[in-house]
């Protein structure tokens, strides 16, 4: 029997009861992105680099948040004689990062799945290689909000309309018999959300960690809804390559993907390393990082059909 559901199985899509959303989302990614692991691309070395170091360098874009931790770990675990050299390129917003990926300024990126799908729909050649993580999202409200109904007529922030965080809000509202017409959904940069909540500009927000834990640390918000109850093993990020880079350096793209997946396994097996690497790449205090890492997973990041 098919029905529309938001609980456990899927983010408000028509699915069969009991289907696992993670697998469904894998198939969406595979169908739209052209997953590197399942496609035999031709290998053509146009614009071949001049040095051995350049030959094995992959420029990877990221935002400094826990969701990019596998990228950081890949860099930390690389060796001088390894098959891949990682050059990390930091950006301050998703639009900047996507512009760099789409135009080939970087070779790959840790990016919101929905933004990659949108790029494909616009005819831009980007290709997914792996998941970024599972979970790691949080819904925060001010202390006066005690039910979804309390959000009627109030402003609620999301990082982007094309995001898992928006899907989670849609599910939350639908479960309560509400819709976007009942709540003012606003786009806002995640770093601005905790402060906006504290001054009453917004009543709550759905976001990737650590920006929920920041509000908890400030004492201005509370956890309102466990996203896992809305969408089990929800995902929002993926490792995505620029398509031209894959065509011209296919073996290198595959080598980096393997190193990335190995890094995810390492993180899953070494929780202490998660904190150490996070502290190096993210400017948050230890309690915020520790709280953030409790709700994010890095096990089994491979995309499989």
Model-derived regions: residue spans:
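Short, glycine-/small- and polar/acidic-enriched structural segments
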Residues: 26, 43-179, 184-187, 203-210, ...
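Secondary-structure end/capping motifs
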Residues: 247-305
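Short, Lys/Arg-enriched N-terminal segments with co-localized hydrophobic residues
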Residues: 3-20
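Periplasmic-binding protein-like
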Residues: 131-141, 221-249, 253, 257-260, ...
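A conserved hydrophobic position in a structured secondary element of the catalytic/binding core
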Residues: 111, 207, 241, 248, ...
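Short helix- or helix-capping micro-motifs
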Residues: 215
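N-terminal Sec-pathway targeting helices
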Residues: 20-33
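Extracytoplasmic/secreted envelope proteins and their assembly/folding machinery
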Residues: 68-72, 98, 113-116, 166, ...
């Amino acid at each position: 029997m098919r029905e529309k559901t938001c609980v456990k199985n899927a983010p408000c899509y028509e699915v069969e009861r009991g289907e696992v959303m993670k697998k469904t989302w894998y198939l969406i990614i595979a169908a739209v992105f052209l997953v590197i692991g399942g496609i035999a691309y031709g290998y053509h070395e146009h614009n071949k680099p001049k040095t051995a170091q350049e030959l094995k360098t992959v420029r990877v874009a990221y935002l400094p948040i826990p969701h990019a931790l596998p990228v950081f770990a890949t860099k930390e675990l690389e060796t001088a004689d390894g098959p891949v050299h990682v050059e990390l390129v930091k950006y301050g917003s998703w639009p900047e990062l996507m512009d760099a990926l789409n135009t080939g300024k970087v070779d790959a990126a840790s990016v919101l799945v929905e933004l990659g799908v949108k790029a494909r729909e616009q005819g831009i050649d980007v290709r997914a290689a792996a998941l970024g993580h599972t979970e790691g999202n949080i819904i925060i409200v001010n202390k006066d909000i005690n039910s979804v109904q309390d959000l009627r007529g109030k402003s609620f922030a999301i990082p982007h309309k094309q995001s898992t965080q928006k899907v989670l809000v849609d599910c939350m509202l639908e479960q309560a018999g509400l819709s976007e017409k009942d709540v003012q959904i606003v786009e806002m940069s995640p770093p601005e959300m905790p402060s906006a909540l504290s001054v009453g500009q917004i009543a709550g927000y759905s976001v990737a960690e650590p920006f929920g834990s920041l509000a908890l640390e400030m004492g201005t918000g509370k956890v309102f809804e466990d996203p896992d109850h809305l969408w089990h093993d929800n995902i929002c990020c993926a490792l995505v390559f620029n398509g031209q880079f894959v065509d011209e350096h296919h073996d290198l793209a595959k080598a980096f993907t393997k190193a990335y997946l190995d890094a995810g396994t390492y993180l899953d097996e070494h929780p202490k390393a998660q904190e150490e690497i996070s502290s190096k790449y993210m400017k948050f205090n230890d309690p915020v990082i520790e709280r953030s890492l409790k709700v994010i997973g890095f096990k089994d990041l491979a995309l499989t059909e």
